[in-house]
Amino acid sequence: REEHAQLVSIQSQEIAKHYPVIQEMVYAIAAFHDLGLEVDRKTHHLESGRIIREDPRLREWFSQEEIETMAQAVEDHRASSDHEPRSIYGKIVAEADRFIEPEKIIERTVQYGLDHYPELDKDGHWRRTLDHLHEKYAEGGYLKLWFPESPNVERLEALRKIIKDETRLRRIFEK
């Protein structure tokens, strides 16, 4: 998890340098964004917000308004969120928390199906994988990238090409 937080921090700083934001806030948000995983995976984003609001050390460096902005940013960072992050800080951490690696995404989608839908046969898993990839990653999918400078822009385009090429997608699915 520490390595993940470092990667999110690096990617956050890369995105943030293009915008008028407070770099120290960006760094703190990246460091705190997943701390709520220690409490509960499903609501970790909300737990992370609570942790920020309750951390007395942050009050030494940030105003109450900045702390609230940081808490909201971590609450808004989930890729599956159904609403746009409330601030540029939320968009930065949401974007930086994504590491779009096309084949890994496909493999994780298949694995999730195997773990959570054991009753499906191979064709059922194929259809579930297709549905999920189209719903989330294809053109018009709910995954939103917020910054043109993000390395994810290129990676998402590569994933979309694979999704459009069902023969190639099927080969990856079959691995």
Predicted regions and their residues:
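Divalent metal-dependent phosphate-bond-processing catalytic cores, especially two-metal-ion Mg2+/Mn2+ enzymes
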Residues: 1-21, 32, 81-175
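An active-site-proximal "capping" alpha-helix that borders the catalytic cofactor pocket
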Residues: 7-15, 43-59
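Hydrophobic, well-structured mid-protein blocks that either form specific transmembrane helices
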Residues: 49-83
